[in-house]
């Protein structure tokens, strides 16, 4: 289970896009898709049955979740997440560095 969720702001810590920030668009198993990160060129073949036009498309590709870290909004640095139980007894995601609750999108 991933500690990152759709809508989180993350920073890339390894790879060709190291240092860039973006918002999580999708999470699948141990891979993550981030807005504006890991742009690849896809050659799309036209298909009359579905009405898809052919051409060369630029789109985001999935990257491994170990190559990103959540961005702490207060410190503007990469951080890790842990879980704690709040006063109401619900499990909350918390930044490890300062103990603040992670804002959910």
Curated annotation (Swiss-Prot):
CDD domains with a match to the protein in the record: KOW_RPL26
SMART domains: KOW (SM00739)
Any one GO CC term of the record: ribonucleoprotein complex
GO biological process, one term: translation
Pfam families per the UniProt record, alphabetical: KOW, ribosomal_L24
Xref: InterPro entries: KOW, Rib_uL2_dom2, Ribosomal_uL24, Ribosomal_uL24_CS, Ribosomal_uL24_KOW, Translation_prot_SH3-like_sf
Keyword annotations of the record: Ribonucleoprotein, Ribosomal protein, RNA-binding, rRNA-binding
Stored SUPFAM superfamilies: Translation proteins SH3-like domain
Entry keyword rRNA-binding: yes
Molecular function GO terms recorded: rRNA binding; structural constituent of ribosome
Family: Belongs to the universal ribosomal protein uL24 family.
Function statement: One of two assembly initiator proteins, it binds directly to the 5'-end of the 23S rRNA, where it nucleates assembly of the 50S subunit.
Complex formation: Part of the 50S ribosomal subunit.
Name the UniProt record assigns to this protein: Large ribosomal subunit protein uL24
Species annotation: Psychrobacter arcticus (strain DSM 17307 / VKM B-2377 / 273-4)
Gene (UniProt): rplX
């Amino acid at each position: 289970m991933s500690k990152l969720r759709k809508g989180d702001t993350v920073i890339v810590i390894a790879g060709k896009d190291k240092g860039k920030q973006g918002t999580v668009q999708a999470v699948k198993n141990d891979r993550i898709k981030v807005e504006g990160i890991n742009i690849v060129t896809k050659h799309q073949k036209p298909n009359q049955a579905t009405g898809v036009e052919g051409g060369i498309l630029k789109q985001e590709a999935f990257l491994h979740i170990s190559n990103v870290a959540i961005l702490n909004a207060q410190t503007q640095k990469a951080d890790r997440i842990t879980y704690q139980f709040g006063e109401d007894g619900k499990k909350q995601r918390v930044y490890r560095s300062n103990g603040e609750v992670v804002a959910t999108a």
